[in-house]
């Protein structure tokens, strides 16, 4: 175990500074279109919503982040396309929208044999799971800017205006259903790489907790696409949705000002326990950085909770309270 107690900021990512940068950028975006295409919400939720008559169009944009560096190290690129689509689609699902179309942006230092084919395989698989089309994209070779490659995309979805879920219907006493993640997903990888580097492990080493796969294999496990949430929306009275990504549970503040009591959270996968031990990362920092086994949350009345859990393979993990975010006895702040 590392004698250091690493944080996300130690690895070079300061969430508070990042939030300041985002706020500064948003403050400059003052022009607002009127009529068809007018924004229905402010910037800052999981997806942007646009007026389209009876419907709302929903848009998201996101990328895979520094997980691509591990893909390069392993020379295995067939999963990061799934990650790219998942990060966008899950944000659409978090406001209740159905994904319909996607465009990707691939920037790279140089072209490598088999690289584009594997990227395409992942994008196709993600699109099939999401039941949407990839309608275009951009590929740029930028050797003076990019070292390795970067993969991002933009996703379009739609829903009826009356079906928009922003969290305004969340009430104290509502139940929280947690849906398992597949592992680290696509956030926190700057800290992950720092931990691996300082621990003396290699991505090619067998996992200490499962010798049948390498550490790199486990870290490249693709982000789960929670498309079954659309089935929950048809069958249940849903009050709120949350995609657990960067900043971990802290991002729940964008859903509601009420509190979250996770009295029975999902068990984090072994990869999280390994990272916590090797990096000397405390539990608070882990929950402020990673999904910790819970990749998506559904907030709804108790009467529908078991049905939602059955549809998604999740379970009841907590309830809505007056204030704060708590995982058992741990206060997340």
Curated annotation (Swiss-Prot):
Q: Which InterPro entries match?
A: PurM-like_C_dom (IPR010918), PurM-like_C_sf (IPR036676), PurM-like_N (IPR016188), PurM-like_N_sf (IPR036921), PurM_cligase (IPR004733)
Pathway linked to the protein: Purine metabolism; IMP biosynthesis via de novo pathway; 5-amino-1-(5-phospho-D-ribosyl)imidazole from N(2)-formyl-N(1)-(5-phospho-D-ribosyl)glycinamide: step 2/2
Question: What chemistry does it catalyse, as a reaction equation?
Answer: 2-formamido-N(1)-(5-O-phospho-beta-D-ribosyl)acetamidine + ATP = 5-amino-1-(5-phospho-beta-D-ribosyl)imidazole + ADP + phosphate + H(+)
Keywords linked to the UniProt accession: ATP-binding, Cytoplasm, Ligase, Nucleotide-binding, Purine biosynthesis
Named from the GO MF annotations, one term is: phosphoribosylamine-glycine ligase activity
User: Which BP terms in the Gene Ontology apply to this protein?
Assistant: 'de novo' IMP biosynthetic process; adenine biosynthetic process
The keyword Cytoplasm is annotated on this UniProt entry: yes
Gene name linked to the record? purM
Q: Which family does the similarity line name?
A: Belongs to the AIR synthase family.
Quote the subcellular location field of this record.
Answer: Cytoplasm
CDD domains, alphabetized: PurM (cd02196)
Record carries keyword Plastid: no
Identify the GO cellular component terms for this protein: cytosol
Q: Which Pfam families match?
A: AIRS, AIRS_C
In Swiss-Prot or TrEMBL terms, this protein is called Phosphoribosylformylglycinamidine cyclo-ligase
- Kind of enzyme, top EC level? ligase
Return the Gene3D superfamilies for the record: PurM-like C-terminal domain, PurM-like, N-terminal domain
The EC number(s) given in the record are 6.3.3.1
Native source species: Methanosarcina mazei (strain ATCC BAA-159 / DSM 3647 / Goe1 / Go1 / JCM 11833 / OCM 88) (Methanosarcina frisia)
